[in-house]
Structures are given as structure tokens and as C-alpha cells.
Amino acid sequence: MVREIIFLHVGQCGNQLGHEFWSVAIKEHLNKKINEKRELVGKHSFMNDSASSFFENVYKNFNLNQKESLKARAILIDTETGVANEIMKSSISPYFDENNIFTQHSGAGNNWSQGYMYYGKMYETLIDNIIRKNVEKCDSLQSFYITSSLGGGTGSGLGSYILEMLSDNYKQIKFSNCVFPSACDDVITSPYNSFFALTKIHEFSNCVLPVSNDALLDILNSKKLKEKKNDKNDYSKMNNIVANVILNLTSSMRFEGSLNVDINEICTNLIPYPFFNFMLSSLSPCVETENIRTFDHLFKNVLNRNNQMLIANPKDGLSLSMAFLVRGNINISDVTKNVLLIKNNLNILRYNKDATKIGLCNVSPLNQPYSLLCLINSCEIRNSFLQILERFNKLFKRKAHLHHYLEYLTMDDILEFKEKIQNLIFEYSYIQKNSFCSPKFLNRNTINILGYDICEENDTHDNNYINLESSNPYYLKSKIKKCDKSISWFDFKTKPII
């Protein structure tokens, strides 16, 4: 059964990421080496049914000479026309439907509140109509995939509004691929924009895959790919790295494989509680020119700092779950062996050590024999949130540029945003310290059925009941008599407690 994905590229950065992604995705699907065994698909066809997850007009009698009728399931949204015009003048323009392009001329002024409060409400109906028309073309819509930046006004503000609108109107998975601005971003108000957008993305996305400009620049420096004369600029190379992350993430949905993984499975297997929905991602190789000596070398590199999409060390944080998505003609035993080696180097939640997802796509990436994308739901992500909060506080304490936002927001609104970010940091820090989530994520009725009760920190323990083992959180007390130890905390991992 076809499971379609609709891509929404919002703002300048989001559309540039979309341009890079679709440029390579189209090459992969049309590449003769990938499609050299076309007779397996059909006598006159060159694409299989899985391609219809990402493209419209994929017919069984589709011919190479008619490839321009193929249309990407992509919607381009921006409050300026520059990037969209560049895309429509590029070599891949025939693959985009002009009816799926929404642009304006005013821009959002690098102001989250203007993009969210003003343009969001103004263009809601127009954008919603475009989305609905694309949804109606799908047989079985699987998810929405949104690319945007948190530093500007359109990607952060209008992107947040669109994400909230999707959450209200559709039950499908919302997957956000957002770019955190660097510490020396040229947009002076980016600390405000990223701060406000982060709360909305966390609240209305099912899964968030953040990347940071600082980490991408570090990758370019480490791979010695800084801008050269007559070569791509650094931004294009950074976008290409992120595009490769998306390509690896979606490879199992686009091509055949022995262990296919779709986006729904990522959300189901890697997110133990809806609140903890951020993923650390790392890619090996990061660039096409990188030399990978052996398959084992992929796994040795993937946890290195210079392969991380955020400035974070997964080894320092508590890992709640993880996924390894591999491309290439690889034996599953080689993957399993290397996964075990990586897990030995990570601090994994002790009662959830088996929370590992493996995906194998048989089709190699362009210009490389194989590649690996590693996703880790790690508490180390909280350091990125701390940086966003600190940059916000530096401006907020001085009320610098705040009047631009007070036109649409009140001080109470801003303080509420701050409380949400602080709570986000607290919850990740809590589970990092205690290895258990805070009690507010548990369903009391289910806990009682399992023979436990949730107690407050100041509750006194009844002498008639046993104390829980040290592996149990403080807020659970047993309702079982001393003679009955039939239920333990570890039983919870196979039962619905949220």
C-alpha cells in the first residue's frame, strides 16, 4: 500500500533545503545505475510504486521521455519570491507544480510574531486550500514533512502557524526538520525567533529533527570543504548535508530494502513519551567526497563530533532510544555487530536497552557504496535548548528589539513561552538524572491496576507495604504486601502507562 508524504518547505532556508533535497532525490530516481534492472518494474516503466510516496503521476506505463510530467509532492511557501523563483528557473523546475507554490512580496521582517500572528492568520485559508488539494491526491497519506529555519521570520513564525494548523486539521504524523541559528547569526532578532518557534515545534510536531548552522560549519571545516573559487558556497554545501540526512531518512520509503522503515515507525519506536520528541542525528559519510574505507568505518565515524548535526556528544547524555538507517548492499549481521559496539559506548536507559530500530535500504546513495544515518533520542539535546534560552535572556533582560514583538504579543505571552522552554529543559534534565520521567506523564489509573500508586515527594511510606527496589522512581509506592513480589517496575515497559 502506498503511503504518501507531503513536503512543506517554508521560508528561505526551508525552500533552499527543499531545493537540495529534491535535486538529489530526482537524480536518485532517474539515475540509470539505480534503474538498470527496469524489467523488474515493467517493460516501459522506470520507477516502481514506492516512488509515488514522493511523486505524483507515477504510472505503470510511465516512459523516460515523459518524465517531466512527474511532480514532486512538495509545497513551497515563502513571504518573498527570491528562492522560489530560483527553484523554478533551475533544472528541476518541471518537477514542481506551480499551483503548489505560495509566495508574497512583503517578507516577515525577521519577526516571529509578525509571521505567526499576522501573516499566519492572513494567509491561512489560501495555504490550507493548497494543502487540502494535495491531500486529496493521496490514496493513503502517511505524514507531513516540514523544513524551515528558526532564525528568520517566515520559517519560524509562519512555519509555526502552519504546523499548528496541520495539527488541528490532520491526524497524520508531523515531522519537523528545523535549523537552529548559529551564535553569530546575521539576523539580530534570531534569539527571539528561535525561542518562540521552539515551543510551537515541540508542541505540535510528532517528531523533531533539529540541525544547527554551527555544527554544519564544523563539518565543513573538518572535511576541508570551505568555499573555494568557482565552487559551491558554504550555505549550499550545508544545505546539501541536511538534504542527505532527509534522503537517508526516507530511503526505505523510496526504494526496496530488506528492513524498510517509514516515518511512522521512527515516531513509534523512538519516542517513549510524546513530550520527548527531539532526535539527535549524525550522518556518515556527511559529504560525497568523504572517503569511507570499510563498512565498519561508517559506524566508527557516526558518533564523532564532526558527524553530528547538532553540537552535542551523544555519549554524554542518557539515550532513551535509537535508530540506525543504512543504505547499500550490506549484510544484516555486519550491521548488528556494529550496532552492539555503538550501544556499548552509549549511556542507555537501563530498562529500555532494546529500544533500537534498524533499517536497511538496498539502494546505495549517489557516489558512495553505502551510508549510515543514526538517530538518538538523547537527553543531551537539553544543552541546545539551554543555549537558545541563554541567547533569548541576553536580549530580553535589556528589552532589546522587544518592541517589534510587543506589537503582537503581551509580556504575559512572552513569560509563558519562557516557562515552556524552562519546563522542556527541566524534564530532559530530570530523566537524565533519575532515569525515569516525572510522574505527570503517567496515567494514575493504569498504575493502580498494575499494583502501584503515585505518591508525592512529601508522602510518608506505610510500614505495611514494601519499599520499591532502587531501580524504581521515588514517586511510585507498591500496593503489594511484602509476600507478593509478582509485579516489578520493569513490567511497565510492556504495558501502556502513559
Annotate each predicted stretch with a short phrase.
Residues 1-459, 465-498:
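Terminal, contiguous helix-loop blocks that mediate binding/assembly
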